[in-house]
Protein backbone atom coordinates (compact mmCIF):
# COMPACT_ATOMS: atom_id res chain seq x y z
CA UNK A 1 0.00 0.00 0.00
CA UNK A 2 2.73 2.46 0.89
CA UNK A 3 4.40 1.83 -2.46
CA UNK A 4 1.38 2.94 -4.51
CA UNK A 5 -0.43 5.64 -2.55
CA UNK A 6 0.67 9.28 -2.64
CA UNK A 7 3.14 9.77 0.26
CA UNK A 8 1.57 13.07 1.33
CA UNK A 9 -2.03 11.85 1.23
CA UNK A 10 -1.05 8.72 3.15
CA UNK A 11 0.25 10.86 6.03
CA UNK A 12 -2.47 13.52 6.19
CA UNK A 13 -3.69 13.93 9.74
CA UNK A 14 -0.65 12.12 11.14
CA UNK A 15 2.44 14.24 10.39
CA UNK A 16 1.26 16.13 7.30
CA UNK A 17 -1.28 18.94 7.01
CA UNK A 18 -3.59 19.90 4.16
CA UNK A 19 -2.25 22.49 1.74
CA UNK A 20 -5.62 24.27 1.83
CA UNK A 21 -7.06 24.92 5.29
CA UNK A 22 -10.61 26.26 5.25
CA UNK A 23 -14.24 25.24 5.70
CA UNK A 24 -17.24 26.23 3.58
CA UNK A 25 -20.89 25.49 2.99
CA UNK A 26 -21.53 22.53 0.67
CA UNK A 27 -23.01 24.88 -1.95
CA UNK A 28 -19.84 27.03 -2.12
CA UNK A 29 -17.29 24.27 -1.67
CA UNK A 30 -16.83 23.40 -5.40
CA UNK A 31 -16.34 27.06 -6.36
CA UNK A 32 -13.76 27.66 -3.61
CA UNK A 33 -11.93 24.47 -4.53
CA UNK A 34 -11.76 25.69 -8.12
CA UNK A 35 -10.41 29.02 -6.87
CA UNK A 36 -7.62 27.23 -5.00
CA UNK A 37 -6.62 25.40 -8.16
CA UNK A 38 -6.68 28.67 -10.12
CA UNK A 39 -4.51 30.39 -7.50
CA UNK A 40 -1.91 27.63 -7.55
CA UNK A 41 -1.84 27.53 -11.36
CA UNK A 42 -1.42 31.30 -11.62
CA UNK A 43 1.33 31.53 -9.00
CA UNK A 44 3.23 28.56 -10.43
CA UNK A 45 3.23 30.22 -13.85
CA UNK A 46 4.17 33.69 -12.63
CA UNK A 47 6.85 32.53 -10.16
CA UNK A 48 8.55 29.94 -12.36
CA UNK A 49 11.95 31.59 -11.76
CA UNK A 50 11.56 31.96 -7.98
CA UNK A 51 12.11 28.31 -7.05
CA UNK A 52 8.55 27.76 -5.82
CA UNK A 53 8.41 24.90 -3.30
CA UNK A 54 4.90 25.04 -1.84
CA UNK A 55 1.75 27.18 -1.58
CA UNK A 56 -0.45 27.13 1.54
CA UNK A 57 -3.96 28.63 1.36
CA UNK A 58 -6.13 29.72 4.30
CA UNK A 59 -9.51 31.45 4.18
CA UNK A 60 -11.07 33.66 6.87
CA UNK A 61 -14.46 35.13 5.95
CA UNK A 62 -13.65 37.50 3.06
CA UNK A 63 -9.89 37.16 3.37
CA UNK A 64 -7.45 34.80 1.63
CA UNK A 65 -4.07 34.19 3.26
CA UNK A 66 -1.36 32.76 1.01
CA UNK A 67 1.94 31.40 2.26
CA UNK A 68 4.50 31.00 -0.52
CA UNK A 69 7.64 28.96 0.20
CA UNK A 70 10.32 29.85 -2.32
CA UNK A 71 14.05 29.33 -2.67
CA UNK A 72 14.49 32.87 -4.03
CA UNK A 73 12.07 35.08 -2.07
CA UNK A 74 13.58 38.25 -3.51
CA UNK A 75 12.11 37.37 -6.90
CA UNK A 76 8.66 37.02 -5.33
CA UNK A 77 8.79 40.23 -3.30
CA UNK A 78 10.56 42.45 -5.81
CA UNK A 79 12.02 45.87 -5.16
CA UNK A 80 10.00 47.57 -2.45
CA UNK A 81 7.31 44.89 -2.65
CA UNK A 82 6.33 45.83 -6.21
CA UNK A 83 6.15 42.22 -7.37
CA UNK A 84 3.87 41.29 -4.47
CA UNK A 85 1.43 44.04 -5.41
CA UNK A 86 1.48 42.88 -9.04
CA UNK A 87 0.75 39.32 -7.92
CA UNK A 88 -2.09 40.51 -5.71
CA UNK A 89 -3.70 42.48 -8.52
CA UNK A 90 -3.30 39.59 -10.94
CA UNK A 91 -4.93 37.19 -8.50
CA UNK A 92 -7.84 39.59 -8.02
CA UNK A 93 -8.43 39.64 -11.78
CA UNK A 94 -8.20 35.84 -12.02
CA UNK A 95 -10.68 35.33 -9.19
CA UNK A 96 -13.05 37.97 -10.55
CA UNK A 97 -13.06 36.29 -13.97
CA UNK A 98 -13.60 32.89 -12.36
CA UNK A 99 -16.44 34.21 -10.19
CA UNK A 100 -18.41 35.15 -13.28
CA UNK A 101 -18.18 31.57 -14.62
CA UNK A 102 -18.76 29.59 -11.39
CA UNK A 103 -22.26 29.56 -9.88
CA UNK A 104 -22.38 30.02 -6.12
CA UNK A 105 -19.09 31.90 -5.98
CA UNK A 106 -18.76 35.39 -4.56
CA UNK A 107 -17.11 38.21 -6.43
CA UNK A 108 -13.33 38.05 -6.47
CA UNK A 109 -13.10 41.79 -5.71
CA UNK A 110 -14.75 41.33 -2.30
CA UNK A 111 -11.86 39.34 -0.87
CA UNK A 112 -8.66 40.69 0.65
CA UNK A 113 -5.58 38.76 -0.43
CA UNK A 114 -2.62 38.64 1.93
CA UNK A 115 0.66 37.09 0.76
CA UNK A 116 3.38 35.86 3.11
CA UNK A 117 6.69 34.77 1.58
CA UNK A 118 8.86 32.22 3.41
CA UNK A 119 12.39 31.39 2.32
CA UNK A 120 13.34 27.74 1.84
CA UNK A 121 16.52 27.23 3.85
CA UNK A 122 17.53 23.89 2.30
CA UNK A 123 16.59 24.02 -1.38
CA UNK A 124 18.50 20.81 -2.15
CA UNK A 125 16.30 18.91 0.33
CA UNK A 126 12.99 19.90 -1.33
CA UNK A 127 11.59 17.26 -3.67
CA UNK A 128 9.70 19.86 -5.73
CA UNK A 129 12.82 21.88 -6.47
CA UNK A 130 14.90 18.78 -7.19
CA UNK A 131 12.32 17.39 -9.64
CA UNK A 132 12.05 20.75 -11.39
CA UNK A 133 15.83 21.00 -11.66
CA UNK A 134 16.08 17.50 -13.15
CA UNK A 135 13.38 18.32 -15.71
CA UNK A 136 15.12 21.54 -16.74
CA UNK A 137 18.41 19.72 -17.30
CA UNK A 138 16.69 16.97 -19.27
CA UNK A 139 15.21 19.63 -21.55
CA UNK A 140 18.76 20.87 -22.16
CA UNK A 141 19.60 17.33 -23.36
CA UNK A 142 22.07 16.51 -20.57
CA UNK A 143 22.63 12.78 -19.94
CA UNK A 144 20.13 11.62 -17.33
CA UNK A 145 22.64 9.48 -15.40
CA UNK A 146 24.89 12.48 -14.91
CA UNK A 147 21.92 14.59 -13.78
CA UNK A 148 20.76 12.00 -11.24
CA UNK A 149 24.26 11.54 -9.85
CA UNK A 150 24.71 15.28 -9.30
CA UNK A 151 21.26 15.70 -7.71
CA UNK A 152 21.87 12.83 -5.29
CA UNK A 153 25.20 14.33 -4.22
CA UNK A 154 23.57 17.72 -3.61
CA UNK A 155 20.77 16.13 -1.58
CA UNK A 156 23.26 14.20 0.54
CA UNK A 157 25.18 17.39 1.27
CA UNK A 158 21.89 18.99 2.34
CA UNK A 159 21.53 16.31 5.02
CA UNK A 160 18.66 14.15 3.77
CA UNK A 161 18.53 10.57 5.04
CA UNK A 162 17.41 9.05 1.76
CA UNK A 163 16.45 9.94 -1.80
CA UNK A 164 14.88 8.04 -4.67
CA UNK A 165 14.65 9.30 -8.26
CA UNK A 166 12.65 7.70 -11.06
CA UNK A 167 12.73 8.82 -14.69
CA UNK A 168 10.46 7.40 -17.41
CA UNK A 169 10.33 8.09 -21.14
CA UNK A 170 12.61 8.08 -24.16
CA UNK A 171 15.80 8.44 -22.15
CA UNK A 172 18.72 9.91 -24.11
CA UNK A 173 16.52 9.79 -27.22
CA UNK A 174 16.12 6.00 -27.25
CA UNK A 175 13.55 4.54 -29.63
CA UNK A 176 11.85 2.51 -26.89
CA UNK A 177 10.66 4.26 -23.75
CA UNK A 178 11.74 2.77 -20.43
CA UNK A 179 11.70 3.49 -16.71
CA UNK A 180 14.88 3.69 -14.64
CA UNK A 181 15.32 4.58 -11.00
CA UNK A 182 17.99 4.81 -8.34
CA UNK A 183 17.93 5.12 -4.58
CA UNK A 184 20.44 6.21 -1.96
CA UNK A 185 19.74 5.81 1.74
CA UNK A 186 16.35 4.84 3.23
CA UNK A 187 12.88 5.58 1.82
CA UNK A 188 10.43 4.00 4.34
CA UNK A 189 7.15 4.55 2.49
CA UNK A 190 5.15 2.33 4.86
CA UNK A 191 6.22 4.19 8.02
CA UNK A 192 3.69 6.90 8.84
CA UNK A 193 6.07 8.83 11.08
CA UNK A 194 8.62 9.06 8.25
CA UNK A 195 8.68 12.54 6.72
CA UNK A 196 8.62 11.73 3.00
CA UNK A 197 8.66 14.67 0.60
CA UNK A 198 7.36 13.65 -2.84
CA UNK A 199 7.14 15.56 -6.12
CA UNK A 200 6.73 14.87 -9.80
CA UNK A 201 7.50 16.98 -12.87
CA UNK A 202 7.36 16.73 -16.65
CA UNK A 203 10.26 17.45 -18.99
CA UNK A 204 9.19 18.45 -22.52
CA UNK A 205 12.02 17.35 -24.81
CA UNK A 206 12.35 17.04 -28.59
CA UNK A 207 11.90 13.27 -28.23
CA UNK A 208 8.71 13.56 -26.19
CA UNK A 209 7.68 13.94 -22.57
CA UNK A 210 9.87 12.49 -19.80
CA UNK A 211 8.35 12.00 -16.36
CA UNK A 212 10.39 12.69 -13.23
CA UNK A 213 9.48 11.50 -9.72
CA UNK A 214 11.46 12.30 -6.57
CA UNK A 215 11.10 10.92 -3.03
CA UNK A 216 13.10 12.56 -0.21
CA UNK A 217 13.29 11.11 3.32
CA UNK A 218 14.00 13.92 5.80
CA UNK A 219 13.74 11.96 9.04
CA UNK A 220 11.12 10.59 11.42
CA UNK A 221 8.53 12.77 13.15
CA UNK A 222 6.41 11.72 16.12
CA UNK A 223 2.70 12.65 15.72
CA UNK A 224 1.94 15.98 17.36
CA UNK A 225 5.54 17.17 17.28
CA UNK A 226 7.18 19.55 14.86
CA UNK A 227 10.07 18.36 12.78
CA UNK A 228 13.28 20.18 13.61
CA UNK A 229 15.59 21.06 10.77
CA UNK A 230 18.76 19.04 10.81
CA UNK A 231 21.67 21.34 11.52
CA UNK A 232 24.45 19.09 10.35
CA UNK A 233 24.50 16.75 7.35
CA UNK A 234 24.72 13.04 7.89
CA UNK A 235 28.10 11.40 8.06
CA UNK A 236 29.22 10.56 4.57
CA UNK A 237 30.63 7.12 3.77
CA UNK A 238 34.31 6.62 3.16
CA UNK A 239 35.82 8.26 0.11
CA UNK A 240 36.20 4.98 -1.76
CA UNK A 241 32.53 4.16 -1.23
CA UNK A 242 31.42 7.69 -2.06
CA UNK A 243 32.76 7.34 -5.60
CA UNK A 244 30.50 4.36 -6.25
CA UNK A 245 28.13 5.25 -9.06
CA UNK A 246 24.41 4.71 -8.40
CA UNK A 247 22.89 1.61 -9.97
CA UNK A 248 19.80 1.83 -12.12
CA UNK A 249 17.09 -0.76 -12.52
CA UNK A 250 15.07 -1.16 -15.69
CA UNK A 251 11.34 -1.52 -14.99
CA UNK A 252 10.12 -1.40 -18.56
CA UNK A 253 9.75 -5.20 -18.78
CA UNK A 254 7.79 -5.34 -15.51
CA UNK A 255 5.40 -2.57 -16.53
CA UNK A 256 4.77 -4.21 -19.91
Curated annotation (Swiss-Prot):
One of its GO terms (cellular component) is cytosolic small ribosomal subunit. It comes from the Bacteria. CDD domains: KH-II_30S_S3 (cd02412). Pfam families: KH_2, Ribosomal_S3_C. The keyword NAD does not apply. Keywords: Ribonucleoprotein, Ribosomal protein, RNA-binding, rRNA-binding. SUPFAM superfamilies: Prokaryotic type KH domain (KH-domain type II), Ribosomal protein S3 C-terminal domain. GO terms for molecular function: mRNA binding; rRNA binding; structural constituent of ribosome. Residues 39-121 form the KH type-2 domain. Disulfide bonds: none annotated. Residues 227-256 are annotated as: Disordered. Residues 246-256 have a biased composition (Basic and acidic residues). One of its GO terms (biological process) is translation. Binds the lower part of the 30S subunit head. Binds mRNA in the 70S ribosome, positioning it for translation. Belongs to the universal ribosomal protein uS3 family. Part of the 30S ribosomal subunit. Forms a tight complex with proteins S10 and S14. This is Small ribosomal subunit protein uS3. The lineage of its organism: Bacteria, Bacillati, Cyanobacteriota, Cyanophyceae, Synechococcales. The gene is rpsC.
Amino acid sequence: MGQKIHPTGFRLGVIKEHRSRWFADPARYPALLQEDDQIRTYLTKQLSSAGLADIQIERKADQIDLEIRAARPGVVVGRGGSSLETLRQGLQKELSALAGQSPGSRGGGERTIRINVVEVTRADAEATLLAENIAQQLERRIAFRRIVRQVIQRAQRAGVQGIKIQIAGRLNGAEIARTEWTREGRIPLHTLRADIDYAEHLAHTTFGIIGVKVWVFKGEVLPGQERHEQKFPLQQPKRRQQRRRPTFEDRSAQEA
